[in-house]
Amino acid sequence: FIDQMPPGMRDTLYFKDDDSRLSFLQGNYVTLTNMSEKDMNRIVRYRLEPINISFQTTNPELRCKMLHNRFAGEALKKVDILYQGGIEMNGQIVLCRGVNDGEELERSIRDLTQYLPLLRSVSVVPVGLSKYRDGLYPLEPFTKEEAKEVIRTIEKWQKKVYAEYGIHFIHAGDEWYLLAEEEVPEEERYDGYLQLENGVGMLRLLFNEFEEGYAKLEDGVHQEEISLATAKLAYPYLERMAKKMEEKYKGLKVHTYCIRNDFFGERITVSG
């Protein structure tokens, strides 16, 4: 996404933080492409876990193409060092339409199950497409039906893995459910929200916390007006919660505004 940033912003926003130390300290996802065997052994020696890995695919040739790095395929072997060293990991697959979806996604999930249970979770999230894509690979956003297919694939593998390991392992980012216009899974499916900051389970946690707080409220009168701003995907859900609050408190008016993203482009439909 850094290659899709608008020009003229502060320098730190263009910094590609592919650093295992930041993965350990801040949860960054790393590709392992710039790490030596010595670096990997240091992670094992000092127990710098969990390490968050951006896989994208387990197809070595395709990974080289996606990351524009001729060592990207070979870098996948470094996961074996972490696994053999007993290091806990989380992973992500940024899905690109027509590139690493479909059969490639099936292959990636199947390959990554060999690292269970040390690879605790893998999220599948759609690639973000800003309006600043000059010179980049021509990608298109996923359709509603394609989002449904991604969900079906993930849920199929969740059932397989859960039957053997008791965890769901592979998780769909919230955006897939919003795009497919399906309800997000129940809390139990998120295995303790291991990838919350990666956009996996945020809506379910919000819904549950809202209902928990709502159940404690007493009916009353509040002559207030409140404004909420959000982006396209979450808008109907926040609007639904706002209406429920208006029914609870007579006189309360909640205005929910759906904001079009002109800064990054209209195809960026999430807010954080």
Describe the residue ranges of each PLM region.
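Conserved Radical SAM active-site core
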Residues: F1-L118, G128-W157
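Auxiliary Fe-S-binding modules of radical SAM enzymes
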Residues: Y115, L129-G272
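Conserved residues at the C-terminal ends of beta-strands
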Residues: S54, V125, G173
